[in-house]
Swiss-Prot record:
Biased composition (Basic and acidic residues): 652-671, 697-710, 923-934
Span list, region Disordered: 1-96, 631-671, 687-710, 915-941
Pfam families, per database record: DUF3715 (PF12509), PIN_TASOR (PF24630), TASOR_alpha-beta (PF23314)
Tissue specificity note: Present in skin, brain and testis (at protein level). Ubiquitously expressed at low levels in the majority of the organs, expressed at higher levels in kidneys, spleen, thymus, seminal vesicles, uterus, and ovaries and its expression is almost six times higher in male tissues than in females. Highly expressed in seminiferous tubules with a strong signal in Sertoli cells, spermatogonia, and spermatocytes.
Phosphoserine PTM positions: 339, 628, 631, 668, 793, 836, 921, 1059, 1508
The name this protein goes by in its record: Protein TASOR
Result of knocking out the encoding gene: Embryonic lethality with robust developmentally delayed phenotype observed at 8.5 dpc, progressing through 9.5 dpc with full lethality by 12.5 dpc. RNAi-mediated knockdown in zygotes results in formation of multipolar spindles and increased ratio of arrested or incorrectly developed embryos.
Gene3D superfamilies: 3.90.228.10
GO biological process: anterior/posterior axis specification, embryo; constitutive heterochromatin formation; mesodermal to mesenchymal transition involved in gastrulation; protein localization to heterochromatin; transposable element silencing by heterochromatin formation
Location relative to the cell: Nucleus; Chromosome
Outcome when changing residue 130 to P: In MommeD6; severe developmental delay leading to lethality before gastrulation
Length: 1610
């Protein structure tokens, strides 16, 4: 810092001296310091204009005086010009301007342009540019530093953690990254940090698990910035940590890693991902430069990725304007021999035009090179050694040459600049060697002495070598020291010789070939072919480029001559595109350019297309359309090959009807040519479909011919119908359906071929011959053509015609499956003769399960049909059609061939539906269409909803009457439905008998035709094959009988609740999967138990916010039903009904539920009063564990939703604070949850915050993830204590006295305890004012001394300087109080003390701030503050984890014996646990507690705790708790079964449970916790080691012993 001060101080002096001094030659010496000073002050011209700089200095002085009043005089004195006083210079060199303290600023700290902090931010930006030339494009207007204590603290903690882990210093070093954001996002990012999910880039990792930041400050988005663009950039301070390099996912080498899901996940033990190819990006316009230069930061927490990486901290925000006046270079061909390609090591888009040595009088200075981004040539050829001998002052040079020549903005284009009759061009001079810094020394000398190197050139030219500072415009300032020189060439004559196109045309006129008039009219073919050729660039090395052009030129000609395809139209020329620097929105992939250029240079014939070839293509496509109407259609069919199918359907029909009309026949006939043409079309189609050769070409054109059948005009179809009503082909109208893939109609069409009948063809031929004969002039050629087209040599030829069919059906899934009939896919169906009554189906060929969708089944399977000469006519299938609503007469019908050809043919099938047309139900359809068709041979699919009326069956099949089909599957269906209805009816009867409310939500299963099966699926069959309900009931009945016999043998009478009379009801309950167990058993959970018994304190509460008042117990069994039976080992007469019991039941709002269960009511009525009262008392204490919660969120977030769902599942209820305050009871507790990141901005917006703080039953928690709630690792907010903030009226000397202040501080000292600290926070300006008054006023000095005394006791704190301490503001402001409340989040209360009359008190209380006077605070402290100490009053103890050791448990017992409440939402586990103690046990415990005290009591407790833990561990190992018959007590206990807890995770309060000898917990429930703590039984007690054998629980012992022998329930 001292060095920096020494370098800055002389600059300041020199600048002031230059302003005060004169000009002329004296002004040349301090030119360089003046320039530096102007840079430091934010800019200024080089001429030494003093006006703007003095104004800026005055403003800076006022700014410093405004923020630091104590330095006003010093700053003013420093601002005065001193002149040339040499003695003061050493003193000023040692002076250092103090930096502004960031800790005393708000979130945003604006920086003044020209200040040192502003320059530091600019240096960060400029040093992070990818291209140094970006300095001239970015203009930064405003800058603000970001001060976020929370994020900075986390950043420091992260560094400390990494350093503790042994990371290297290189990994811990700080650097900077950048992110361009919208204005509205700045506030959120600076307050909360950068959250994951902010980017859509996936190159380096998943954006949902990390954040992406830009490495370079000039590469902020994927698309280049446009001129005039504005934006905001957030500068982040980053710590890269351990970096992992990621291969480019688009490269071939990392294809496997791209396919792997783990490739996008963050890497453990790392903090950052970068791209392997990042070093290859050397230009802003490089391909994928933005993606490959990103940083990817992430951080792992305990078991998941953090939402905000801590090693990324916002540092500053700057606003910029992008100005891009530089035009895109027109890459002209070089005219100089010393021009070579761009030097890619420096910049990809900078042309290196000359390399050589720079000499000074023959002495080598450095190795340099000349480069330019706009110009590709030098105006003159330079020698390899450039010797410069002349030096000139810049001021003298500007007197001879206009100053505008020395402005860098003048040279923005690729051409020479003409100014004042001089042609000039500018280049950059870069030092090429990395050894030494000779050019830097040269730069310093030129800048310091304001000199210019001059080199005279030939042709009356000059070369000037200048410093970058000498090329700055007067309205700009150089911000970064540049290490390059500028080379300025000046000539009196132009040096750029650009040959225009006009000159070329004049000198070498092109010859215009003959017969090119038509070609020149459609020169658009060139653009069309070149656009289409872009698709072939990937294979440009394997094919000839001219052949690709020929292909697309031919296609263009086809479009132009009416082939039916959309004609290509060249886009109109837009001159505005020439002004744009970037024509495309994103960089294009130009990796193929090098190969193309190489081929273009060394194989130019590949890029040539001769005029002769072009004429051939033109004439070929022009003549191709001029076919004769009587000629064959082979040529037209070849054009429509497989790749042209999508254009062949409708366009051909138009061509065939329009083109022949344009041709003039040489014969003038009177017959109707159109009608003859239509007949020939029909004959040609018949020839191709019936009598054609089975050669490959004929097979190729079949799809085309099928479509030609549809292209016939309306009158021809009518003619065909009238001439052949029932025997010939019925042509169906083509429905206007959309064309599917490859031009095929998506409808299910089945075109049926006629087997051929000589009579049909002869009738057609005779009619045509007769029409020709009746013509006025007989046309022999036409007649011969017709005969040739027919191909008829004899009538017997038609009997030997082969049948061939090839159907292509496109079947897609129906979007309306419920509206369409079911379809069936059949394979390998062999049809028998007419006499065969069976339809055989190869079951092995169809193996798709019924649940498989149609899209999962292959659609290219073939149905092989073996034709038989005796097949019956398809007209016999009157009940069969493609769809029940489609009649058979609309389809293609064909008569059966009379030939004996047995050749097997193949028919392509794609999910052809087989349903009955007249069937009324799926069952009828199934019976009509198949025999022996089990579900194993049927595939249920869906049918296309666009099936038209013209679709029909194309296969002859045998229709078997429905009566002949056995209905095996219907038997299964009826059996299952019968059992289902029987089971449902029995369940309903049992539920009604027990008065259990239920909702029947199970609908009767519907068996469709394709879902019928002989038995259920394997999974269901294996689980339902046995009568599990009956077996369960029998086992339970047997077990209960064993228990009764065992108990009777011991002479213990049982209560009526479990007598044999109730065995039937118990068995009925067991049939539903319920268990009737004793309350002494530990096999069930008691999440919701006996709440109605303790509801007398809850009359005013909302029933929706409390636990359910059910007495049922949830069982963790398949049916999850609830039932409970309470038993007792005491012999109580049946008529003993105690008054306390009736009283408690009467108070319950849910007494109807209890009275509705007679067994439970009888048992409760027979309980002893003491036992029942103990139960009620314990249930009341259990009610204290009912925790309501409220999640405070300003915006919906996934985390809050997850927490809400989790807490709701645990049985907690959500409650708004206002609702809680209105209807709360003494037992209610509320937990307010807020995200830690929202504390600073939203904690004060919690409704009723002041009132909530007063209540001890309200606690606050700050969370970062769901695990914080599960593991109780959240931050406890507003724990205890508080702090006071006062205004100037409290320390006003006219009001306050020393005695009153001492009383107040004494009261504050008594109030503050280690558990609840109180503190008085005083603003800095008040202390400063007391210091100033203390020089003259003894009272102020005494007050200040008293405050200092208590400041040492940490009862008084002087706040650091911040915005409130300004002289123009009144402290404290509302924002200041809110910020202090968030910063001191552990202190519960904030009190604003004032002696003024506050009008808007509600504005303070709404933000959680208590407003009071000093007297009111001391006298009414309890009413103002309420709860504030966790020890002296009822408090919310910290949640005890599952792994607390014995020492921490025993230490809790040493605290005060006040009642404590557990505010845990899941109470250490997920379900509350209850213990029930009898009166005997309570008396024994009470006696032991009274008899022990002091150290003995603590020792006994510790011994008992230790023994209890030992016994529990041993019992857990044995899987089952054993009963100690010699030392037991009548303790009945209800436990609750959790979902998936660990046995080691037991709450600390579980040590205060009943004697370990009475713990009866099975293996299934051994991991559950008991939450009985001090509030259950009042004071801590020691566990008794002796028990009376007379009170042994025989019933429980017998039940457990019998369950060990045989337990069907397990």
């Amino acid at each position: 810092m001292a060095t920096a001060a020494e370098t800055e101080a002389p600059s300041t002096d020199a600048s002031w001296k230059s302003r005060g001094g004169g000009g002329g030659d004296d002004g040349m010496k301090p030119a360089l310091p003046e320039l530096e000073s102007s840079l430091q002050n934010g800019g200024g011209d080089g001429g030494g204009g003093a006006g703007p700089e003095e104004t800026a200095a005055a403003e800076a002085a006022r700014s410093y005086g405004h923020e630091q009043p104590q330095q006003t005089s010093e700053a003013a004195a420093a601002a005065l010009p001193k002149g040339a006083e040499e003695p003061e210079r050493p003193f000023r060199r040692s002076f250092q301007i103090p930096r502004k303290s960031r800790e005393k600023k708000a979130l945003f700290q604006p920086l003044t342009p020209g200040s040192r902090e502003f320059e530091d931010v600019l240096n960060i930006l400029h040093s992070s540019y990818l291209e140094p030339s970006s300095v001239t494009y970015f203009n930064y207007r405003r800058a603000c530093l970001i001060h976020n204590e929370l994020l900075e603290k986390e950043f420091t903690e992260k560094r400390r953690e990494l350093k503790f882990d042994g990371r290297l210093d290189k990994e811990l070093s700080e650097s900077y990254a950048f992110l361009m954001v919208d204005r509205y996002q700045v506030q959120s990012i600076c307050e909360k940090g950068l959250q994951v999910g902010q980017s859509k880039i996936t190159v380096l990792g998943s954006p949902s698990m990390g954040i992406y930041l830009c490495r370079y400050a000039d590469l902020l988005q994927a698309n280049p910035l446009e001129a005039g663009a504005v934006g905001d950039v957030v500068i982040f301070k980053i710590m890269k940590g351990k970096i992992k390099s990621i291969y480019d996912p688009l490269s071939v080498k990392s294809l496997e890693s791209m396919l792997s899901k783990n490739a996008l996940d963050p890497t453990p033990k790392h903090e950052c991902h970068v791209s392997k190819n990042a070093s290859r990006i050397t230009s802003l316009l490089a391909y994928r430069a933005y993606e490959l230069t990103q940083y990817y930061f992430y951080e792992y927490g305990f078991d998941e990725v953090r939402r905000r990486p801590r090693h990324v901290c916002p540092y500053a925000v700057v606003s910029f304007t992008y100005k891009d006046d530089v035009q895109t270079p027109k890459f002209l061909s070089p005219l100089r021999s010393n021009s070579f390609n761009a030097d890619r090591n420096i910049d990809k888009f900078n042309y290196t035009l000359w390399k050589g040595q720079l000499l000074n009088k023959g002495k080598l200075l450095c190795y340099i090179s000349l480069r330019s981004a706009n110009r590709a040539f030098l105006p003159v050829k330079l020698p390899e050694k450039l010797d410069v001998e002349t030096v000139m002052s810049i001021d003298c040079l500007k007197q001879k040459i206009p100053p505008s020549f020395f402005y860098k903005d003048t040279y923005v284009g690729p051409n020479e600049v003409l100014k004042n009759g001089m042609y000039c061009s500018l280049y950059e001079v870069v030092e090429k060697t990395r050894i030494g810094s000779n050019m830097e020394c040269l730069l310093q000398k030129l800048e310091k002495e304001k000199l210019v190197l001059v080199k005279p050139l030939g042709d009356r030219g000059y070369l000037f070598l200048l410093s970058p500072f000498q090329m700055v415009s007067p309205y700009e300032h150089q911000t970064v020291k540049s290490r390059i020189l500028h080379a300025l060439f000046l000539f009196q004559e132009p040096r750029c010789l650009i040959i225009t196109q006009k000159g070329i045309m004049n000198t070498t006129p092109l010859e215009k070939p003959e017969n090119l008039a038509d070609i020149l009219k459609i020169t658009q073919f060139l653009q069309f072919s070149l656009i289409q050729c872009r698709k072939e660039f990937k294979t440009i090395n394997t094919i000839n480029f001219h052949s690709v052009v020929e292909k697309y030129v031919s296609e263009f000609f086809k479009r132009g001559f009416g082939s039916g395809k959309r004609e290509f139209f060249m886009f109109s020329y837009d001159s505005r595109l020439d002004d744009r620097k970037f024509l495309y929105s994103a960089p294009r992939n130009k990796s193929h350019i090098d190969d193309c250029l190489h081929t273009y240079i060394y194989q130019p014939e590949m890029y040539q297309l001769s005029i002769f070839k072009l004429k051939e293509l033109f004439e070929e496509n022009w003549r191709r359309q001029q076919f004769s109407p009587l000629s064959d259609y082979e040529g037209q069919e070849e054009e429509l090959n497989g790749s042209k199918m999508k254009f062949g359907k409708r366009n051909n029909s138009r061509d065939e009807t329009t083109e022949p009309e344009q041709q003039k026949s040489s014969h003038s006939l009177d017959y109707d040519k159109d009608r003859v043409k239509e007949l020939i079309n029909l004959i040609q189609c018949t020839k191709k479909n019936v009598g054609g050769d089975p050669d490959p070409e004929d097979t190729k054109s079949k799809n085309v011919l099928k479509r030609k059948l549809e292209d016939l005009p309306e009158n021809m179809r009518k003619f065909a119908k009238t001439s052949n009503s029932t025997e010939s082909c019925h042509l169906y109208e083509e429905s206007p359906q959309s064309i599917g893939l490859l031009g095929q109609d998506p409808n299910l069409r089945v075109q049926q071929e006629d087997s051929g009948n000589t009579g049909d063809i002869h009738k057609l031929y005779n009619w045509l011959s007769e029409a020709l004969a009746n013509a006025r002039h007989s046309d022999g050629f036409l007649t011969e053509t017709v005969n040739k087209a027919l191909g008829l040599s004899s009538s017997g030829a038609y009997e030997e015609l082969k049948q061939k069919c090839d159907y292509e059906l496109n079947s897609t899934l129906d979007k309306k499956e419920s509206e369409q009939p079911a379809c069936t896919k059949i394979e390998n169906v062999h049809f028998k003769d007419a006499q065969s009554p069976l339809l055989e189906v190869d079951a092995a060929s169809v193996k798709y399960p019924p649940l498989l969708s149609s899209s999962e089944v292959g659609i290219n399977h073939k149905l092989h049909c073996k034709e038989d000469p005796n097949l019956i006519n398809v007209n016999n299938f009157e009940g069969c059609s493609l769809c029940p609503t489609v009649s058979i007469e609309h389809g293609f019908l064909r008569q059966h061939s009379k030939s004996n050809d047995d050749e097997e043919t193949e028919i392509h099938w794609k999910l052809i539906p087989i349903t009955g047309g007249n069937a009324g139900s799926p069952e009828d359809q199934h019976g009509k269409h198949g025999e022996k068709q089990t579900p194993d041979t049927l595939k249920g699919t869906t049918e296309e909803d666009t099936v038209t009326a013209g679709q029909a069956m194309a296969v002859e099949e045998q229709c078997v009457p429905a009566a002949e089909l056995p209905r095996v599957s219907e038997i299964t269906e009826n059996t299952v439905l019968g059992e289902f209805h029987l089971f449902s009816r029995k369940v309903e009867e049992i539920l009604k008998e027990k008065n259990v409310s239920y909702v029947s939500a199970i609908s009767t299963p519907i068996f469709s035709a394709q879902e019928k099966m002989n038995r259920l699926s394997e999974f269901i069959h294996s689980n339902t094959s046995k009568a599990g309900v009956e077996e369960f009931v029998d086992g339970l009945h047997e077990k209960l009988n064993t228990v009764v016999i065992t108990a009777s043998a011991k002479g213990v009478s049982l209560p009526p609740a479990v007598s044999a009379n109730h065995s039937h009801a118990a068995a009925a309950l067991a049939s539903l999967g319920r268990r009737v167990v004793s309350i002494s058993s530990s096999d069930f959970s008691a999440k919701e138990l006996f709440e109605p018994l303790c509801s007398e304190h809850l009359k005013d509460n909302n029933s929706n916010e409390q636990y359910s008042s059910s007495v049922e117990v949830e069982m963790n069994r398949p049916h999850h039903c609830k039932e409970l039976m309470l038993t007792s080992d005491h012999t109580v007469p049946g008529d003993t009904v105690l008054e306390p019991t009736e009283k408690e039941i009467t108070k319950s709002p849910s007494d109807i539920t209890i009275s509705a269960q007679p067994a439970l009511s009888n048992f409760i009525s027979q309980l002893e009063p003491e036992v029942f009262n103990s139960l009620v008392k314990i249930m009341k204490d259990v009610q204290k564990n009912t925790v309501k919660f409220y999640i405070h969120e300003e915006e919906e977030s996934v985390l809050c939703k997850e927490i809400k769902e989790y807490l709701t599942k645990l049985g907690n209820t959500e409650c708004h604070p206002d609702q809680f305050l209105e209807r709360r009871s003494n037992l209610d507790k509320l937990l307010i949850i807020i995200q830690n990141e929202d504390i600073a901005g939203f904690i004060h917006k919690v409704p009723g915050l002041v009132t909530l703080k007063k209540l001890p039953c309200v606690s606050f928690a700050g969370v970062d993830s769901l695990d914080d709630v599960k593991n109780h690792t959240y931050n406890e907010l507003f724990v205890s204590g508080g702090f006071i903030v006062s205004d100037e009226s409290i320390l006003n000397l006219e009001v306050v006295t020393i005695e009153s202040l001492k009383i107040f501080l004494t009261f504050l000292e008594e109030l503050s305890t280690p558990e609840g600290k109180w503190q008085w926070k005083i603003h800095c300006k008040f202390q400063k004012k007391l210091k100033e008054l203390g020089r003259m006023n003894t009272k102020a000095l005494s007050l200040l001394t008293l405050l200092n005394v208590y400041q040492k006791k940490h009862l008084v704190e002087i706040l650091s300087y911040h915005s409130c301490d300004s002289q123009t503001r009144n402290a404290p402001e509302m924002d200041c109080l809110i910020r202090l409340q968030a910063q001191n989040i552990q202190q519960r209360h904030i009190v604003f003390l004032t002696e003024k009359n506050i009008k808007m008190v509600s504005s303070y209380t709404d933000n959680g701030i208590v407003v009071a006077t000093t007297e009111d605070f001391m006298q009414n402290f309890t009413s103002l503050v309420g709860y504030h100490n966790s020890v002296t009053e009822e408090s919310l103890p910290p949640l005890l984890g599952a792994n607390e050791n014995l020492e921490s448990q025993s230490a809790l017992l040493e605290n005060d014996e006040k009642d404590e409440e557990d505010m845990s939402l899941d109470s250490g586990d997920e379900i509350s646990h209850i213990e029930v103690f009898s009166n005997v046990h309570s008396e024994i415990l009470a006696g032991e507690t009274k008899g022990s005290s002091g150290t003995d009591q603590k020792k006994n407790i510790q011994i008992e705790l230790q023994s209890s833990l030992d016994v529990q561990n041993s019992l857990l190992e044995d899987k089952t708790y054993l009963i100690d018959c010699e030392a037991s007590a009548p303790i009945d206990r209800v436990c609750s079964e959790g979902e998936s807890s660990n046995s080691a995770e037991q709450d600390a309060y579980s040590d205060f449970q009943a004697d370990q000898n009475q713990l009866q917990m099975s293996h299934q429930c051994s991991h559950f916790n008991v939450l009985t703590h001090q509030t259950f039984l009042g004071t801590p007690y020691a566990l008794s080691s002796t028990r009376s054998q007379e009170n042994e629980n025989y019933f429980l012992s017998a039940y457990k012993n019998s369950g060990t022998e045989k337990s069907p329930l397990s």
